[in-house]
């Protein structure tokens, strides 16, 4: 799929910034490019959700694939970028939106979009990306079944925070037993957090199969 592009050209010293705060890629040289990207994506998703919760709900209601990717791309408003340009895979944007949605639910936000749940038994899709998606949902379903409180704490933790490190250590023992060998997926923090957030937000009930893993 084509990368989502958000771009904005502004003077750094501009006195007026729209609310919520637009995203900016941190310039801290001690952070890896991946970590800088995670922080910027978090801020971007947070801004987009506040500006267009209805649009986020509509995009996430689309079936996964090119249609949903186009809907996500339309949400990539320049108003949520302080300056410069961001290019990212729509799947990363999707995951960040679910993380922010679940964080806001935990904070008591009552104006969030409703995203329909689904059954893992009805997982469909032939493309590699969709197969990986369902593998991740099955994986996250298993993790939530084994330790839901730890999964919730990990999702709600701020990116690169000490809490994220601690909660990842807490949840690590249940990750291995939930991994199946049928799909090769890189399980980094962002991927794990996004999958857990989707399972938790959409209200998927942990399956008996997951509980038995």
Where are the predicted features?
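Functional cleft and adjacent loop/helix regions within the main domain
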Residues: 37, 92, 106-111, 208-211
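N-terminal Sec/ER secretory leader and immediately downstream segment
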Residues: 2-100
């Amino acid at each position: 799929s084509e990368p989502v592009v958000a771009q904005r050209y502004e003077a750094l010293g501009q006195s007026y910034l729209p609310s919520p705060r637009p995203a900016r890629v941190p310039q801290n040289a001690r952070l890896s490019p991946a970590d800088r990207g995670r922080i910027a994506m978090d801020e971007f998703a947070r801004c987009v959700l506040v500006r267009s919760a209805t649009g986020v709900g509509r995009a996430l209601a689309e079936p996964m694939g090119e249609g949903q990717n186009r809907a996500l791309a339309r949400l990539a408003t320049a108003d949520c970028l302080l300056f410069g340009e961001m290019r990212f895979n729509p799947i990363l944007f999707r995951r960040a939106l679910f993380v922010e949605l679940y964080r806001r639910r935990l904070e008591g936000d009552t104006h969030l979009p409703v995203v329909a749940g689904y059954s893992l038994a009805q997982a469909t899709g032939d493309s590699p990306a969709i197969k990986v998606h369902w593998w991740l949902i099955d994986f996250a379903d298993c993790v939530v079944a084994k330790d839901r409180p730890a999964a919730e704490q990990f999702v709600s933790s701020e990116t690169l925070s000490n809490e994220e490190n601690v909660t990842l250590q807490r949840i690590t023992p249940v990750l291995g037993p939930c991994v199946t060998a049928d799909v090769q997926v890189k399980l980094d923090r962002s991927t794990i957090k996004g999958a857990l957030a989707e399972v938790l937000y959409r209200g998927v009930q942990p399956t008996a199969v997951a509980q038995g893993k």
